Amino acid sequence: MIELNPVRQRITDLTDRVLSLRGYLDYDAKKERLEEVTRELESPDVWNNAEYAQNLGRERSSLEKTVGGIASVLDGLADATELLELAESEQDEDTALAVVADLDKHQAHVEKLEFQRMFSGEMDNAAAFVDIQAGAGGTEAQDWAEILLRMYLRWCESRGWKTELMEVSGGDVAGIKSATLRVEGDYAYGWLKTETGVHRLVRKSPFDSDNRRHTSFTSVFVSPEIDDNIDITINPADLRTDVYRSSGAGGQHVNKTESAVRITHIPTNIVVACQTGRSQHQNRDNAMKMLAAKLYELEIQKRNAEKDAVEATKSDIGWGSQIRNYVLDQSRIKDLRTGIERSDTQKVLDGDLDEFVEASLKAGLAVGSKRVDA
């Protein structure tokens, strides 16, 4: 019979990790939101706005993975505890070994959930645009750009993401000069963002009749898709409303009734006022329209600032911003930021990028991160 105390301790440790995740991933709020979204999707009227319904469907899918994942692991760990007690009482080693095998699966699930903590950025769950630009070097560089495009397409396919080639400019002889790929899926931008930078290829060129070694560069830039559909929701609790007597033209209502309305939006300190209506109700309605317009403009300014920040990041990517070397004639691909190195080069170029991307995310890397020695 195997020793059971380490197995019990493992169940306890995994349970503690999941309970910690419940708080970090805001399980209770997500569960409540999942119930709301599910109820809304069950309404026959929701499909009157197909785009809105599709967005709700995507939100439900994302919420189900978190809420369902945590609940599933907790249920599994509870079952493991009961089975372990049964195995001990009956001295059944096969059952005990089955519990250990189940714990391996639960641990992998917990680690996957814990990895979601990497995606704390506001835009991490957005769709992503991947821009690929061949560097100087003619046909060799353009062929390298196409190889990278294929690599990302394969990687996205392996993750079940939806891809759309938005633009592609063919090379002079082979390959591509540039391409833009749109990627939609769970945390697409969060996963892809650390791929921004310059990718360096070293190989014996198939386009060189003398089979000489060539070095080529291609830049990759990843940006989030900014949702331009702005829904302004005003929480009544965020408003302070003052009423006062109108001044100026207004006939019999001037200085006789407090029909003028001033509304202060406390979070932004935006103040709007209206006194032209003939009733307080009318002035309040007009003031709320003015407030909604100002909040809309504020959101537009915020999103434009986000776009400007993304473009500023793009301009910072110089040809010295290398993030990964692909030295194919030595069967070596090395990430210059994390030190991760692989020798199965064809497998990587076929889209097996998880190890590189996960290491970058765990290191909290961003554009311009410090390189390790190549």
Curated annotation (Swiss-Prot):
Please outline how this chain is modified post-translation: Methylated by PrmC. Methylation increases the termination efficiency of RF2.
Q: What SUPFAM superfamilies does the entry give? A: Release factor
Pfam families reported for this sequence = PCRF, RF-1
The highest taxon in the source lineage is Bacteria
PROSITE patterns reported in the protein's UniProt record? RF_PROK_I
Q: Report the subcellular localization.
A: Cytoplasm
One cellular component term from this protein's GO annotations in UniProt:
cytoplasm
For the modification N5-methylglutamine, the affected residues are 252
InterPro entries in the record: PCRF, Pep_chain_release_fac_I, Pep_chain_release_fac_I_sf, PrfB
State any single GO MF term: translation release factor activity, codon specific
Decide whether keyword Cytoplasm is in the record.
Answer: yes
Which UniProt keywords are present, listed alphabetically?
A: Cytoplasm, Methylation, Protein biosynthesis
The UniProt family comment states: Belongs to the prokaryotic/mitochondrial release factor family.
What does the protein in this record do? Answer: Peptide chain release factor 2 directs the termination of translation in response to the peptide chain termination codons UGA and UAA.
Q: What is this protein called?
A: Peptide chain release factor 2
Its lineage opens with: Bacteria, Pseudomonadati, Pseudomonadota, Gammaproteobacteria, Lysobacterales
What gene name is given for the protein in this entry?
Answer: prfB
